Amino acid sequence: MGRWHRTGLLLLATVFSSSAWALEFRSILSDRTVMYDTPSLRGKKLYLASRYYPVEVIVSLEHFAKVRDVAGELAWVEKKRLSEKRMVLVNVSLADVRQAADENAALVFQAERNVALELLEYTNTGWLKVRHPDGATGFVRISQVWGT
């Protein structure tokens, strides 16, 4: 096998392995979205999900997506019920949202466990810029939310 052939194969393997590990998150588009045990409207209805609830897409079919929620539970949902809007869910008792991506920055607001926040921007500092449903924006530690 030639040197360039091996290099090309290594490059392809790297590209495909890194993209295979990329996480795809979406949020639920509307309140009372039915989550199913199979990719069919005839499947067993497992629970209802609320608007903005973040989910991780595991499998994507033509009309359905298999998703994982914050608890690790798997379910199927109609793809048309998913939004591109990125949301994160507070996974600690009380998350501090600050004016800047700094522990010493002024506190803008606090969000309780299970509050959904819109993800506005990633930083490379361990913080995310988020927006509360009431419109307030700030930075939250990535360790205090799920959905990234």
Predicted regions: what is each one?
Residues 8-17:
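Bacterial N-terminal signal peptides
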Residues 1-9:
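Bacterial N-terminal signal peptides that target proteins for export
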Residues 20-37, 45-51, 58-136, 140-148:
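SH3-family beta-barrel domains
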